[in-house]
A protein has these predicted regions:
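Conserved AMP-binding/adenylate-forming
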Residues: 1-119, 126-129, 142
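AMP-binding/adenylate-forming catalytic core of the ANL superfamily
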Residues: 78, 104-175
Length: 175
């Protein structure tokens, strides 16, 4: 849940609820990060790592980073980790799905950061991340801003190769 989502719920729905979000998946039958009733809630942040999850945020080189956007990873095997895909000879698809980006580290595919308070912020899927001029920008960040305009009914953002770089193009449908 985004910071704006937290504010909306606390302002418009219920002020005294312990709101939390998650990041996980059906493939792992679990959460990498999730809420914790015993920790404070900070708008837009997920409080904790999941039980048995050695979760971290990596930069492009596989180094651990704090307060900077990067890739959500799990550095060690975990209890509910799938061990293979059915009919995947030589585990090629399995390795490509989770272990291709960082050697022997599970790459979840979420663009995230760990904050100075120890919470996690999820910005969207990293496979929908654009990289113009070497600056990583999640499409969710663009959509979050575009959705603030009542005049816009729908939008889609793409990255286009242009002059040895990537440029961002936003298409909109007006109301």
């Amino acid at each position: 849940v985004s910071e704006d989502g937290f504010r909306y719920i606390y302002d418009k729905i219920k002020k005294d609820v312990h709101l939390s979000s998650i990041s996980g998946g059906t493939d792992i039958i679990s959460c990498f990060v999730l809420g914790n009733l015993f920790q404070p809630v900070y708008a837009g942040e997920i409080q904790n790592r999941g039980l048995g999850m050695d979760v971290d945020i990596f930069d492009e080189n596989g180094s651990s980073i704090k307060n900077t956007k990067g890739e959500l990873v799990c550095k060690k095997p975990f209890p509910s980790m799938p061990i293979k895909f059915w009919n995947d000879e030589g585990d090629k698809k399995y390795k490509a799905a989770y272990f291709e980006k960082y050697r022997n580290v599970w790459h979840h595919g979420d663009f995230a950061k760990v904050t100075s308070k120890g919470g996690f912020v999820i910005f969207g899927r990293s496979d929908t991340t654009l990289n113009p001029g070497g600056v990583r920008l999640g499409t969710a960040e663009i959509y979050n801003e575009v959705e603030k305009f009542e005049e816009i009914q729908e939008s889609i953002v793409i990255g286009q190769s242009w002059k040895n770089d990537i440029r961002i193009i936003l298409f909109v449908v007006l109301n």
